[in-house]
Amino acid sequence: MAHIRNLSSRAYISNSLKESLGRFEMYRYSFIYAPTGYGKSKVCKTFFKNYSGYTVLWIDANSSPDIFWENFCNAIKILNPSFAASFKKTGFPDSEEDVNTIINLLSIMNSDKSSALLIIDNFDNIMDDNLSKIFASAYSSTAVGFKYIFILRKITSQNIINLISKDEALGISKKELAFSLEDIED
């Protein structure tokens, strides 16, 4: 059972899940993964709605790659308009040259804001080899101020699994999203 108790437009978040979600600050990348119905998006929207110290940007990838890229550029525009224009000019990366251009931009882009959190919902809908290369490079980037949360139904990339198993990225699975006996009794 998911962490969705009907609290109007909010989700019930147990203390243990709050603690897990709060650990995102220790990582550049966080992955929240569970099958449909576990309340991943609703929990994240509730938890990060008024999270202090971060500019939280929500990008829904439940669309075409081009619409995702447009939304990504609009989110980046809030943080750094000149970089957003460069991303938009390049377009959704569909060639090796585009991938390298995006990697270079991400490696030098810093947030003018103190800290930025980009949450990409339904990331597995648009994840391909090019985006995998881009985000693998961005992981080791020296750009400061950016953290990413990827919401997925399942993780199929061995690179992501390796990051989580080596504790180099945060992984929150259906185990953390499911209600415990204490949550149900509460």
Language model features with spans:
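Conserved catalytic network of the ASCE P-loop NTPase/AAA+ motor domain
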Residues: 23-24, 108-113, 138-145
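P-loop NTPase Walker A phosphate-binding motif
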Residues: 30-58, 74
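Conserved NTP-binding/hydrolysis module of P-loop NTPases
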Residues: 66-89, 107
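Alpha-helical sensor/transducer elements of the RecA-like P-loop NTPase core
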Residues: 42, 133-186
